[in-house]
């Protein structure tokens, strides 16, 4: 019986996801790790970041469009504000369809 969990920190989880991507098994892994509600919440979070980065709608409008609370939008906004301009550029490149 193991006395320690296999995965103890965020970096180990990121390494696991990277390995799954390299083996083209990421969909199986991520689907197993999250319930349908958690997957929906993650999709909403990604859309929050997309809309905040576009800057075309108010937080209230984003909230209404995505069906999430304004506090959820605010938390996403605060996370985005904490990133450097370089990090924001990388995130925009990943998320925004040009």
Curated annotation (Swiss-Prot):
InterPro entries, alphabetized: Trp_repress, Trp_repress_bac, Trp_repressor/repl_initiator, TrpR-like_sf
Subunit structure: Homodimer.
Protein family membership: Belongs to the TrpR family.
Any single GO CC term annotated in Swiss-Prot or TrEMBL for this entry: cytoplasm
Record's subcellular location: Cytoplasm
Residues annotated as transmembrane: none
GO biological process, one term: negative regulation of DNA-templated transcription
Residues within the DNA-binding region(s): 59-82
GO molecular function, one term: sequence-specific DNA binding
Signal peptide feature range: none
Protein's name in the database: Trp operon repressor homolog
UniProt function note: This protein is an aporepressor. When complexed with L-tryptophan it binds the operator region of the trp operon and prevents the initiation of transcription.
Keywords, alphabetical: Cytoplasm, DNA-binding, Repressor, Transcription, Transcription regulation
HAMAP family attached to this UniProt entry: Trp_repressor
Species: Vibrio atlanticus (strain LGP32)
């Amino acid at each position: 019986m193991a006395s320690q969990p296999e995965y103890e920190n965020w970096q180990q989880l990121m390494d696991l996801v990277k390995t799954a991507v390299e083996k083209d098994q990421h969909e199986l892994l991520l689907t197993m790790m999250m319930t349908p509600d958690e997957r929906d919440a993650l999709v909403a979070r990604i859309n929050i970041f997309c809309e905040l980065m576009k800057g075309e709608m108010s937080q209230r409008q984003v909230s209404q469009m995505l069906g999430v609370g304004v506090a959820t939008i605010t938390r996403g906004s605060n996370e985005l504000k904490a990133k450097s301009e370089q990090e924001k550029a990388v995130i925009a490149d990943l998320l925004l369809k040009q």
